[in-house]
């Protein structure tokens, strides 16, 4: 449930941010309510800077925005990786208990063994029930974050190119 709530929250945040970035793409004035606007503001605030320094400043701006865009993704990835392992741990523990019961009581009652094995496998199923949707949610949310980061990279490259062209013309 935690992974689902985290994914929904990050998806909604990134959808809002993505909408603001899209609006910023259509605007000439930098609006600091979105990552692209904050990066554009760096360009606006430094019109006479040499190209190399501007490129470094813009890259720094993108790097500052990236952690907020990728927030929560590592936790989703960890949950997706650990859930099946926890299920497997439960299965192994259940199988150990089943074999201990066989050692004590013998293998005469297959129903008793089947029940133990069945309950042991339930933990694997539960682990997979957590992991599979979490991997899917991680992929969707990560894709949304990476699209925004790609826009930032693309726009900063364009700003550096325009800045270089303007310097060459003058």
Language-model segment annotations:
Residues 2-6, 89-92, 96, 131:
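Alpha-helical transmembrane segments
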Residues 12-107, 136-170:
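Predominantly long cytosolic amphipathic alpha-helical stalk/bundle segments
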Residues 4, 40, 87, 117, ...:
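Residue-level signature of catalytic and energy-coupling elements of molecular machines
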Residues 111-142:
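Pore-lining and gate-forming transmembrane alpha-helices of multi-pass membrane transport proteins
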Residues 1-17:
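Hydrophobic alpha-helical transmembrane segments
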């Amino acid at each position: 449930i935690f992974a689902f709530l985290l994914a929904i929250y990050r998806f909604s945040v990134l959808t809002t941010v993505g909408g603001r970035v899209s609006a910023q793409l259509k605007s000439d004035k930098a609006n600091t309510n979105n990552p692209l606007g904050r990066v554009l503001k760096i360009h606006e605030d430094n019109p006479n800077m040499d190209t190399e320094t501007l490129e470094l400043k813009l890259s720094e701006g993108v790097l500052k925005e990236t952690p907020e865009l990728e927030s929560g993704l590592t936790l989703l990835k960890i949950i997706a990786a650990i859930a099946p392992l926890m299920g497997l741990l439960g299965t192994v523990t259940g199988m150990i208990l089943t074999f201990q019961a066989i050692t004590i009581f013998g293998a005469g009652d297959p129903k008793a063994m089947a029940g133990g094995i069945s309950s042991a496998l339930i933990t694997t199923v539960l682990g997979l029930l957590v992991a599979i949707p979490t991997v899917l949610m991680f992929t969707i949310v990560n894709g949304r974050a990476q699209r925004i980061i790609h826009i930032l990279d693309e726009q900063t490259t364009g700003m550096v190119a325009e800045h270089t062209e303007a310097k060459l013309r003058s």
